[in-house]
């Protein structure tokens, strides 16, 4: 007798990234799980090592990461972590997540985040890590 029930986290069954992500996304909101403290100097935003959960996908920063935010001297910048599942992911190379910067004259003037169902058929997902106030010397505040 065949069954439409398929085990996921059972012995001798395969757990895919989508299966794993689906579980996390249904019970935990996007965000920093630990570490990932933010500081700034001039146009440099520094993020310390830590763990994040974005779109149900767990990722980690293994070293201090510097994001240069130099596209504006007034207004605001929003720092995104963008997931793109069409990019490479191998045991040696991971290119499916990166930082992106958006700029706006107002703190609420940013476009809507792209949050496709990446644990289904979608391939793109954005998470707003922080919003920065910009000044003539670079980042004025987080």
Predicted regions and their residues:
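N-terminal "first-domain core" detector
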Residues: 1-52
């Amino acid at each position: 007798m065949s069954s439409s029930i398929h085990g996921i986290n059972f012995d001798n069954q395969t757990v895919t990234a989508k299966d794993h992500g689906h579980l996390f996304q249904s019970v935990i909101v996007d965000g920093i799980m630990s570490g990932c403290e933010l500081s700034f100097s001039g146009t440099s935003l520094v993020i310390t090592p830590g763990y994040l959960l974005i779109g149900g996908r767990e990722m980690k920063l293994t070293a201090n990461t510097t994001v240069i935010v130099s596209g504006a001297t007034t207004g605001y910048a929003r720092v995104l972590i963008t997931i793109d599942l069409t990019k490479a992911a191998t045991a040696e190379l991971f290119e499916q997540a990166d930082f992106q910067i958006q700029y706006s004259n107002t703190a609420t003037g940013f476009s809507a985040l792209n949050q496709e169902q990446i644990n289904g058929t979608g391939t793109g997902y954005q998470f707003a890590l922080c919003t920065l106030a910009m000044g003539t010397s670079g980042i004025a505040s987080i």
